[in-house]
Curated annotation (Swiss-Prot):
The lineage of its organism: Bacteria, Pseudomonadati, Acidobacteriota, Terriglobia, Bryobacterales. Catalyzes the rearrangement of 1-deoxy-D-xylulose 5-phosphate (DXP) to produce the thiazole phosphate moiety of thiamine. Sulfur is provided by the thiocarboxylate moiety of the carrier protein ThiS. In vitro, sulfur can be provided by H(2)S. This is Thiazole synthase. It is found in: Cytoplasm. One of its GO terms (molecular function) is thiazole synthase activity. Belongs to the ThiG family. InterPro entries: Aldolase_TIM (IPR013785), Thiazole_synthase_ThiG (IPR033983), ThiG (IPR008867). The gene is thiG. Pathway: Cofactor biosynthesis; thiamine diphosphate biosynthesis. Keywords: Cytoplasm, Schiff base, Thiamine biosynthesis, Transferase. It is an enzyme of class 2 (transferase). The keyword Transferase applies. Its EC number is 2.8.1.10.
Amino acid sequence: MSDKLTIAGREFASRLIVGTGKYRSFQEMQRCHEASGADMVTVAVRRVNLTDRTKESLIDYIDRSKIFILPNTAGCYTADDAVRTAMLGREVGLSNWVKLEVIGDEKTLFPDNAGLLEATRILVKEGFAVLPYTNDDIVNARRLIEAGAAAVMPLAAPIGSGLGIQNPTNLRIFREMITEVPVIVDAGVGTASDAAIAMELGADGVLMNTAIAAAEDAVKMARAMKLGVECGRLAFESGRMAKKLYASASSPLTGVVGA
């Protein structure tokens, strides 16, 4: 893509961010990363072998000269746990960036807004670039930005559900009201058309994992997601035609017999 995604002063050529979980093998994960064109992938700190680096690890299958690793705090249910996990990721050399997750409900995996805000404030003070996974509440997003978040990542639907964009109105509001930091749709994308819709609504980027990893042909789906994000971005930049209630002829009447 010609335009770049900029977060915390760093530029990324791709507006697609992909994950590292649920793949059938590390080799498949690696092929999907290549097919997606993503230059940022998110890694759960809890999944990285931090004690014995001689054993095979998913990190071994990520080309860090081409791909930026975004650690995440998946599985954390309190602000304290999320902060400790982020700190651990930095200490072992992953990154001083973090996709911050503080989960508030085990069944829906919806975020705990209060805990998320608390952890954001702490980690920003500790020098992290914080990208919080949040709901599609503009008020809460504003609070996260005021706390120093480098981006906001509203969900499109529950994590891993594949339901697609469930509240396009709120995402459109995000686009209109948030200009200070990127808006990255996170969670709920199921197929390439969902990614395209998110981008058409004005999202700066899309993050996904299960939609690719759980596809019957994961590599092919990774390629589809790449094209979906690019397609949606181009459509957003193009400015779609206005919707009309009635028909409007696309061909001129000049030269029509009897006109």
